[in-house]
């Protein structure tokens, strides 16, 4: 008698079927990360388009901020809630709006809606890169690199206002609104003199320089695959083998600077390291500002400038500019504080 011994087929459940459907090879990959990314990105972008088109900032900032009121793509914004809302999540069904959509928009509920959905959407996009990299056997450095922009977004739009008195002090979602927030950061925190800002600028501009140098060097050292006179005819874009000479590039930069990258791994790691580290440093600096930490204070120069009218440095001049920014912005931004400044220090009309 023959007895066949085999392993019974495992029963597939709903989770297995869902996993198969989510991770199926299709034109646009969905994946488990898509369950977070796609709805959050949809709601964040949709909320921003709705707010910039229809919703006023009159009740929160005393401003016009929508296309309906005459703004354009550079001046429209979804503005932050009023300072009196503090750190309320401003849920549509919460005690502030009580289910009234119009009132919710007037109070600034769209801003918290966009900020929270936008944060989770960015995190979902990073998880998407992890998931696809894992599926096809890549290292996860793309996702790690994307943590740089995420850290900046979260620190500026969420952590900074959490350290202040309310969401009011976060940037509104608009081009001119972001510019205004940058001026605010300078006036109230002297942000340009902050070492973390300096590292961020060095990282971002250094990365731009590295990209330009790298792209130009690769184009300069392409292997010719034809007799064309220009780059676009001199090689076949679908050729399987390597297309440029690292040895030639190394020799060129060795002659220019005396040093050069010896291998591609170190070169490309450096191109990853510079911008991502710069963004992380900026995010750390903004977290410090959330706690109102000071940066550099050159008190000796301030004291000497106060005593000697002929002594002035770019640092002391910038401090006076910062005082002007504070005097102008505070009274406009926070009318409920009833801040009063002497007439001689305030601007007249639109004159700077």
Curated annotation (Swiss-Prot):
Q: Which residues bind Fe cation?
A: 214, 268
Q: What biological process terms from GO does the record include?
A: photosynthetic electron transport in photosystem II
Instruction: State the UniProt keywords alphabetically.
Output: Acetylation, Chlorophyll, Chloroplast, Chromophore, Electron transport, Iron, Magnesium, Membrane, Metal-binding, Oxidoreductase, Phosphoprotein, Photosynthesis, Photosystem II, Plastid, Thylakoid, Transmembrane, Transmembrane helix, Transport
The answer to keyword Ribosomal protein applying to this record is no
Q: Please state where this protein is localized.
A: Plastid, Chloroplast thylakoid membrane
Provide the residue positions that the database annotates as binding pheophytin a: 129, 142
Residues involved in chlorophyll a ChlzD2 binding: 117
> Which EC main class describes this enzyme?
oxidoreductase
Indicate how the chain sits in the lipid bilayer: Multi-pass membrane protein
Residues annotated for a plastoquinone binding in this entry:
214, 261
* Family recorded in the similarity comment: Belongs to the reaction center PufL/M/PsbA/D family.
Additional detail:
2 of the reaction center chlorophylls (ChlD1 and ChlD2) are entirely coordinated by water.
- Know the name of this protein? Photosystem II D2 protein
Organism this protein belongs to = Nephroselmis olivacea (Green alga)
């Amino acid at each position: 008698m023959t007895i066949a011994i085999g392993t019974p087929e495992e029963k597939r459940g709903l989770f297995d079927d869902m996993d198969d459907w989510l991770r199926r090879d299709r034109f646009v990959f969905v994946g488990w990360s898509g369950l977070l990314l796609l709805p959050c990105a949809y709601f964040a972008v949709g909320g921003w388009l709705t707010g910039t088109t229809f919703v006023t900032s009159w009740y929160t900032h005393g401003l016009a901020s929508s296309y309906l009121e005459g703004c354009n793509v550079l001046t429209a914004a979804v503005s932050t809630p009023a300072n009196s809302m503090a750190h309320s999540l401003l849920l549509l069904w919460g005690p502030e709006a009580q289910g009234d959509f119009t009132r919710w928009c007037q109070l600034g509920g769209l801003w918290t809606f966009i900020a929270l959905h936008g944060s989770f959407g960015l995190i979902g996009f990073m998880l998407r890169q992890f998931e696809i990299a894992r599926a096809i056997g890549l290292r996860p450095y793309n996702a790690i690199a994307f943590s740089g922009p995420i850290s900046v977004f979260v620190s500026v739009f969420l952590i900074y206002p959490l350290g202040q008195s309310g969401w009011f002090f976060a940037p509104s979602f608009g081009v001119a609104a972001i510019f205004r927030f940058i001026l605010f950061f300078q006036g109230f925190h002297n942000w340009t003199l902050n070492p973390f800002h300096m590292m961020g600028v060095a990282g971002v501009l250094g990365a731009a320089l590295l990209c330009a140098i790298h792209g130009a060097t690769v184009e300069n050292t392409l292997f010719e695959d034809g007799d064309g006179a220009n780059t676009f005819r001199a090689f076949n874009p679908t050729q399987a083998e390597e297309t440029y000479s690292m040895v030639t590039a190394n020799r060129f930069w060795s002659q220019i600077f005396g040093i050069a990258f010896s291998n591609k791994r170190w070169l490309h790691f450096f191109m990853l390291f510079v911008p991502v580290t710069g963004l992380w440093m900026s995010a750390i600096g903004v977290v410090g500002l959330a706690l109102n930490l000071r940066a550099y204070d050159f008190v000796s120069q301030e004291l000497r400038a106060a005593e000697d009218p002929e002594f002035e440095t770019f640092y002391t001049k910038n401090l006076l500019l910062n005082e002007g920014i504070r005097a102008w912005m505070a009274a406009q931004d926070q009318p409920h504080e009833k801040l009063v400044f002497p007439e001689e220090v305030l601007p007249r009309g639109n004159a700077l």
